[in-house]
Amino acid sequence: MIASLAAQSQQPVQPDLKALKVRQQGAWSSGDYAIVGTTLQIVGEQLCEALDIRAGQKVLDVAAGNGNATLAAARRWCDVVSTDYVPSLLARGRNRAAAEGLSIR
């Protein structure tokens, strides 16, 4: 019994990443993220300003949410690719970009 427990404790624990991703997607898409995202809009602008992002640069926004940093970079004429694992948030970002006449991918 002790030898069996010792052998089990030496095996690394493998997290179920797929299940974790599904739970996180559910959490981020369950509420009205637009309310939270709107309060963070200035952060996207400040981030682009702090990084001195300029026209023509390539920008990858990972965990883009509803696109605050994506749109801030696109307003600076950057080539922006936006990604998030919550499709509804990406759709909001695309809609916001379209409303401003901005090009994002």
Language-model-detected regions and their locations in the chain:
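Class I SAM-dependent methyltransferase SAM/SAH-binding core
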Residues: K58-R105
